[in-house]
Amino acid sequence: MQLPANPFKAALRRAEPLYGIWAGFATPYAAEIIATTGYDWMLVDGEHAPNTVPTLLGQLQAVAPYATHPVVRAVQGDTVLIKQLLDVGVQTLMVPMVETAEQARELVRAMRYPPHGVRGVGGGLTRATRWDAVPDYIRTAHEQLCLIVQIESPRGVAHAAEIAAVEGVDAVFIGPADLSTGMGHAGDASQGEVQEAIRRTVQATLAAGKACGILAPREEDARRYADWGCRFIAVGIDISLLRQAALANLGRYRATQATDQAAPASRTY
């Protein structure tokens, strides 16, 4: 069989706008529900959600029949962990808190086989090779793998141009929450200096010929970042959407109850 294509990587190269959603429930059932909704991509979070390699595998299998592409965020840029994630079939990998070009180069090496990298060969044990059903996987795997590095600290912003220019880095993703916190604004990315840092990072990424993405659940933020040149934007978080919908639903009934209690008693006998 042929090596599965990576439509997300191809779309990034065509500079298409891609709208995504954060997936934090860490269950295949929830991931599959999200995959039916039509988002271009979903971020399966291995950093802040309670995921492990087996739970990530289950979610990859659950969403495989659908068009929504799974991007998996590792908990950290560990070479051994990256090997495991690629072996279970991750094609698009996001790594948090990348601050230097050297870090980015090491991540590229972790995703490639020798002599261009250090990825170990799992052969017929791995889902990525479809258990040895994909011929020449070792030689061609890099063609369909996509590496996204996260810039989410002042140090990362300072080195954004060098990071984005690293060969093998396909895209940069900005983390506004960590960036703003690192700049002394406790998660408030609306502050002027944080916005300027985001803009500079987008510009540096585009100047290197790479795609830039960001998390922006608020529509006005998402549209502004798109105007600046971001092409893949996460516009929602599944856990937040569930909580907001649950609160809004209950609020309608609480409001009705309060209105009923405030109404005068009927004088009709």
From Swiss-Prot:
The record marks 73 as: Transition state stabilizer. It holds the Pfam family HpcH_HpaI. One of its GO terms (cellular component) is cytoplasm. A divalent metal cation binds at residues 152, 178. Gene3D superfamilies: Phosphoenolpyruvate-binding domains. The record marks 87 as: Increases basicity of active site His. The active site is at residue 48. GO terms for molecular function: 2-dehydro-3-deoxyglucarate aldolase activity; metal ion binding. The keyword Metal-binding applies. Its EC number is 4.1.2.-. The keyword DNA-binding does not apply. It comes from the Bacteria. Its cofactor is a divalent metal cation. Belongs to the HpcH/HpaI aldolase family. This is Hydroxypyruvate/pyruvate aldolase. It comes from Delftia acidovorans (strain DSM 14801 / SPH-1).
